[in-house]
Amino acid sequence: MDAKRQRGPGLTPLSSLDALFLHLESPEMPMHVAGLHLFEMPARRRHLYVDDVRRLFAARLQLAPAFRRRLAPMPFDVANPLWIDDGAVDLEHHVQRRVLPKPGTRAQLHALVARLHAQPLDRARPLWQAFVIEGLASGEVAVYTKIHHAAVDGSAGVALAAALMDLEPMPVPRLPKPHAVDSVSDAGEPTVTQRL
């Protein structure tokens, strides 16, 4: 079945390859992809940095359909699940704060990220999480993000990162264009996943 064809309002079937990522997942082999980014801590911060990150995600959710969709399993698993728009994404769950114990070494950061990466994503929610990690001895803040491979392929992951991060200190206003494509995968050229 064509992965772009809709099965009702807001329902999009998973491709066979994307569904395979769900079926192959096990506790020993999570099927999410992840990134770890280090940022300079903003000067004169008056509130928790995680609140800024949540506001950023909230402002840009409309640019990233993969962050809004959750799985809708088919009855008796007779077919691949569908993606359905979650409506109200719980950013308290999806964007969490962690603080490293002193001294806040890179080894401690890597150990924490390894533990977070080993935890499976909740399939009843959109298949992603972000963790704002403070307490690094360098004064930096780390942001670890993970998203299920069923939700994005490589090119869609790059598009998600571009939708969320700015390359300049002053963010560029991003407003959705009328009748804009829903995602990079809807922009006309098939993604790697769709070509397989």
How should these model regions be labeled?
Residues M1-L196:
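Non-catalytic N-terminal regions of enzymes
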